[in-house]
Amino acid sequence: MLLIITNQEDIHPNPVIDHLIALKVPFFRLNTEHLFSHYDVYYQISNDTNEFCIRTKDGHHSITSKQISAVWERRPCKPMTTFDPIEDEQLANLLKEEGDGFMKYLRIALHELPWIGHAVNEYKAGSKLLQKIVASKVGFNIPQTIFSNNLSDVEQFKTEKIAVKPIRAFGFEISEQENLIFYTSLTNKEKLRDLGEMNFRNNLNFLESYIDKQYEVRTTIIGKADFSAIIESQQFEADKGKIDWRQGYDHGMTFKAFEIPRSIATQCLDFLAYFNLEFGCFDFIVDKNDTYHFLECNTNGQWMWIEDETQLPISEAIALFFMTHHENKAS
């Protein structure tokens, strides 16, 4: 039985669940914001025992340590409520933190099972620095990359054009109606010099040599299967997807099914194998010489928009991946 760990608003599991039902693969969906209000949780550990059971409070669905065959972590979040109303807000928050702590430790305890969205290995794979190191080791071309809070280090770049990226912070809330999102931006050495040392030294800046693009590619790996889409981003203006294709969502950017070279697909598999992962969404720039340049891998990335645009059978491939592990446990 597959354990799906996510939240109620996450729609990505839905098409996969449709395939799981058709394939007769049992599953249990745990929406973590309702941990206390919708589920009964039991885990016993002793010298003789290591067993758990999670069941819905209506008793209609459950999963046990004997049944579980794989885990799919999508988008879990902290418990939003306790079962009973707690008037003391500090106490209520403490109890919800305890519930969230249990869920984190449960995912770590299940680390030896087959996973997509592996709770332990994904943390390591999320390092922007290690990703570049491993990408180079497996044979990818990577842009010259510098992390620095010293303005003089900009002179190390071999190219004049430089991409500025966020390391981990993706934005912040300006108001209840408005958020500021950090996208990749294009600059150059002269503009960075003009910032001055004071504006540079208060941040650990993530900088890459900017590569002029022919087009971009998004490749999704599930197990040994790969699905790629070409992104025609260069027809758009700089702030509408040309520099960071994510800005093109609202401006008519299109995605088409695409076959990447087998050598690139193999390097994707080698990259994930280093981290002992079975899933990853890779972003590439393809330059005007048809050379692929690795940008990053999101090891729990979104993919449903690609399936909707291209009809690539990604959700079916995820279901088949979990079916294989269900059958292996049953045999």
What is the role of each PLM region?
Residues 1-3:
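Extreme N-terminal starter segment of soluble prokaryotic enzymes
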Residues 26-38, 167, 172:
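A short beta-strand-loop structural module common to alpha/beta enzyme folds
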Residues 7-19, 30-142:
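Conserved N-proximal alpha/beta basic substrate-recognition cap immediately N-terminal to
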Residues 198-205, 209-210, 221, 238-291, ...:
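A long amphipathic alpha-helix within ATP-dependent nucleotide-binding catalytic cores
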Residues 46-48, 57-58, 221-226, 287-290:
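Short acidic-glycine loop/turn motifs at beta-strand connectors
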Residues 162-165, 219-221, 290-305:
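A short beta-strand motif that forms the metal-chelation/ATP-contact edge
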Residues 130-182:
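Loop-centered beta-sheet repeat module
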